[in-house]
């Protein structure tokens, strides 16, 4: 039998994940603990890498035990996904280095997505160009299963699509980027200016352990 919980809430910084979600997760006494946070820190005006490393180390150190496997992952290069990706590229790659270093120190499994070109394919992302769509989640789930060594999982998730992503003409791409900025970036920026928490009003989808039917596992 498999019991599953998902405490994730969009838009939280890593320190907020540590203070608002981590203790609840540990009270569930998981034997498999998946943790990821940090990209929202990368998108902030300032980025406290020392604080991020400390939070990550604390989470890894407290979660890792002989009875609990901890798994995390790195981020893909954002420059091909998001109009502002190049601005945050160096931050994201440095963050990936921190993930690798702290994971090695605490014996945490890492799915290193930075080294897999398929994860940079824009067709795996939702319209906000930040979060994965259904296809993206399917690829990530298959990758994590492979990294965990689950029976029947293989590396086929990393195979590229048979065709290249559609390329828009310059004018069409500009129009698409402007529309993206209007629908997603401007509201995000507005919340930041008003100092409204980006995760305000959002809750976890599965905050308690729930049995997963065999056909869904």
Locations of the language-model features?
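Conserved SGNH/GDSL esterase-like catalytic core that processes O-acyl groups on lipids
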Residues: 1-57, 171-215
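Ligand-binding pocket scaffold of soluble enzyme catalytic domains
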Residues: 6, 35-36, 71-73, 95, ...
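Alpha-helix N-cap and loop-to-helix initiation/capping positions
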Residues: 17, 47-54, 86-94, 128-136
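Serine-dependent acyl-ester chemistry module
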Residues: 39-50, 77-94, 217
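Alpha-helical scaffolding segments of alpha/beta enzyme cores, especially the outer helices
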Residues: 51-65, 90, 94-101
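A short helix->loop->beta-strand "cap" motif at the edges of active sites that frequently abuts
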Residues: 61-71, 108
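Substrate-gating cap/lid alpha-helix
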Residues: 80-113, 134-138
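Conserved catalytic region of serine esterases and O-acyltransferases that act on ester linkages
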Residues: 101, 105, 128-131, 135-217
């Amino acid at each position: 039998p498999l019991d599953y919980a998902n405490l994730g809430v969009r838009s939280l910084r890593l320190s907020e994940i540590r203070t608002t979600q981590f203790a609840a997760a540990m009270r569930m006494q998981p034997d498999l603990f998946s943790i990821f946070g940090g990209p929202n820190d990368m998108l902030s005006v300032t980025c406290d890498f020392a604080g991020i490393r400390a939070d990550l180390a604390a989470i890894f150190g407290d979660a890792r035990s002989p009875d609990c496997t901890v798994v995390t992952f790195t981020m893909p290069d954002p420059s091909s996904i998001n109009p502002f990706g190049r601005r945050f590229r160096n931050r994201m790659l440095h963050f990936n280095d921190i993930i690798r270093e702290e994971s090695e120190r605490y014996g945490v499994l890492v799915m290193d997505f930075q080294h897999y070109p398929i994860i940079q394919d824009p067709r795996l992302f939702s319209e906000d160009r930040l979060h994965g769509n259904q296809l993206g989640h399917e690829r990530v789930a298959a990758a994590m299963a492979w990294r965990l060594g689950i029976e029947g999982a293989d590396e086929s998730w990393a195979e590229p699509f048979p065709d290249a992503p559609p390329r828009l003409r310059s004018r069409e791409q500009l129009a698409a980027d402007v529309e993206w900025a209007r629908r997603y970036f401007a509201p995000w920026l507005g919340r930041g200016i008003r100092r409204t928490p980006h995760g305000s009003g959002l809750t976890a989808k599965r905050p308690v352990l729930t049995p997963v039917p065999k056909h869904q596992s």
